[in-house]
């Protein structure tokens, strides 16, 4: 049976937790989220979010009995030579040459690892640690993804030619929770995305400030009429991404948050216990007997 | 004559009305309202329950069970408290094929538990759907750690499942009596 959804409603951390607790074997694919223009209704029958369908696969994780054994991500070069270079075990030149040779000889990662160990380039431990680091960095990346569709398929085996390094998910989950706490902090700092921004001073003061491309895009939309949410949408950013940037701009004193034109109304949650009838055992037993006999054909 | 009631709750479109329809001996007195045809809700279905659903099971001359279904849209949740009053127990219906509603299911569950500490079961509905999550996975997704809380597979249109869900709720009620 499928385990399908998207990260907006079921987070990477929740997924890993589920796979860990149920000791699953299988593969988890995360896809590019393709806009459909349609909306998806959440369970409150009121809130709508963009409905995304699965586009091309962006990342894949393989699990065996609840342990992560392999991860690849489109945006992260997963060739063993590159992995070893990123962890400092090979320099750039070595990595390039080794990769060329491996590709010319059509060597698998496993074959390459063996010949590197035999040639005393690296140790087995280097290889395992480097792959582990690579795998974990992919997972941490995934934990910041917020809307991509995913699918878990049972029993799918990890690619035979790749080196599998089993990793206990619990540590990753704990670390991931820390990352998410950072997001919660940001949410506390900027709780309401319906607020707008305005420049603290003359926008020309931005001239001497070094901003990244993403920051500039946000700055371009700053106007008391635009809510932060609208800016995020215009810049195609997730809530966390926009919060991070707005937070930095606020900290730097470049912008100020201004009151939204329409404040969202929130009804207080009324939760007082209601009177309870304690039924007697006889009543419950009669109900059971009755319900057992109901056999309507629809 | 004694009447007792159970509440069938859960997120929007999870199958509450269907569940009650399947087992009620009367036509469900439903307060359905058509959904505006071009709204997002209408991609899901054409009608939603506005105030409540109301079904009945007559046990004998002096005992009647009423089944109340809560409205799915949160803007009607002022009804919840009224419906929860005096209930024997409740069923949380979840559309197992819609993870986007799990968070709400969890929140509804918490709210009802706060209203009254009665026994409840969770029905992993729409198990006939190709994308349905398994009950075991739903348990983890909804963070129902308490092993005593039953998570049951359900197809709300199928009397066998509906009967089983209600029976399991009644067994839970008995178990609770035994433990007190
Ligand atoms: N395949 C399948 N469809 C179901 C099942 N249960 C309900 N449905 C369908 O799901 C849709 C929603 O069911 P309803 O019974 O109206 O759900 P509800 O929880 O009463 O909805 P609201 O009152 O709007 O919150 C309807 O189209 C039902 O026919 C099920 O077990 N399997
Ligand atoms: Mg209904």
Regions found by a protein language model. Give the residues of each.
Chain B
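Canonical P-loop GTPase G-domain recognition
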Residues: 128-180
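Conserved catalytic network of the ASCE P-loop NTPase/AAA+ motor domain
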Residues: 49, 58-61, 81-86, 112-116, ...
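Inter-motif core of Ras-like GTPase G domains
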Residues: 75-98, 111-115
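Loop/turn-to-beta-strand initiation segments
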Residues: 62-65, 88-89, 118-121
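Switch II (G3) loop of P-loop NTPases
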Residues: 59-77
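Conserved G1/Walker A P-loop phosphate-binding module
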Residues: 1-46, 55-58, 64-66
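A structural signal for isolated positions on well-ordered beta-strands in alpha/beta enzyme cores
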Residues: 7, 121-122, 150-152
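Conserved C-terminal guanine-recognition region of P-loop GTPase G domains, centered on the G4
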Residues: 94-147
């Amino acid at each position: 049976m499928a385990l399908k959804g998207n990260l907006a409603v079921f987070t990477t951390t929740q997924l890993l937790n589920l796979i860990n607790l149920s000791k699953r074997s299988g593969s988890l694919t995360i896809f590019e989220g393709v806009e459909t223009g349609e909306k998806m209704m959440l369970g409150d029958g009121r809130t709508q979010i963009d409905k995304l369908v699965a586009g091309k696969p962006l990342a894949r994780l393989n699990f065996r009995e609840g342990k992560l054994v392999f991860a690849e991500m489109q945006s992260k070069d997963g060739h063993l030579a590159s992995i070893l270079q990123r962890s400092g075990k090979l320099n750039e030149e070595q990595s390039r040459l080794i990769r060329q040779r491996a590709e010319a000889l059509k060597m698998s990662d496993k074959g390459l690892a063996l010949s590197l160990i035999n040639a005393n380039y690296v140790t087995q431990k280097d290889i395992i640690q480097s792959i582990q680091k690579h795998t974990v960095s992919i997972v941490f990346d995934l934990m910041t993804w917020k809307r991509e569709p995913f699918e878990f398929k049972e029993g799918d085996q990890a690619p035979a030619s790749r080196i599998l390094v089993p990793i206990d998910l619990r540590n990753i989950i704990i670390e991931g929770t820390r990352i998410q706490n950072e997001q919660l902090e940001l949410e506390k700092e900027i709780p309401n995305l319906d607020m707008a921004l305005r420049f603290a001073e003359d926008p020309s003061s931005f001239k001497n400030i070094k901003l990244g491309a993403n920051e500039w895009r946000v700055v371009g939309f700053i106007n008391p009429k635009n809510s932060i949410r609208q800016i995020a949408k215009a810049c195609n950013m997730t809530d966390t991404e926009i919060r991070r940037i707005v937070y930095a701009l606020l900290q730097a004193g470049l912008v100020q948050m201004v009151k939204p034109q329409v404040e969202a109304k929130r009804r207080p949650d009324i939760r007082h216990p209601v009177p309870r009838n304690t039924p007697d055992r006889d009543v419950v037993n009669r109900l059971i007997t009755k319900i057992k006999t109901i056999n309507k054909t629809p | 004559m004694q009447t007792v009631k159970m509440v069938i709750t859960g997120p929007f479109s999870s199958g509450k009305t269907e569940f009650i329809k399947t087992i009620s001996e009367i036509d469900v007195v439903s307060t359905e309202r058509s959904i505006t045809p071009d709204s997002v809700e209408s991609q899901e279905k054409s009608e939603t329950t506005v105030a409540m659903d109301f079904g009945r099971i007559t046990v004998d001359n002096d005992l009647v069970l009423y089944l109340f279904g809560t409205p799915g849209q949160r803007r009607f949740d002022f009804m919840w408290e009224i419906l929860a009053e005096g209930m024997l127990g409740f069923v949380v219906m979840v559309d197992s094929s819609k993870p986007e509603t799990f968070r709400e299911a969890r929140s509804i569950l918490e709210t009802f538990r706060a209203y009254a500490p009665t026994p409840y079961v969770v029905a992993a509905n729409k198990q006939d759907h190709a994308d349905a999550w398994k009950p075991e996975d739903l348990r983890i997704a909804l963070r129902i750690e308490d092993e005593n809380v039953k998570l049951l597979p359900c197809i709300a249109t199928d009397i066998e499942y509906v009967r089983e869900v209600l029976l399991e709720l009644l067994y839970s009620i008995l178990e609770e009596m035994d433990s007190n």
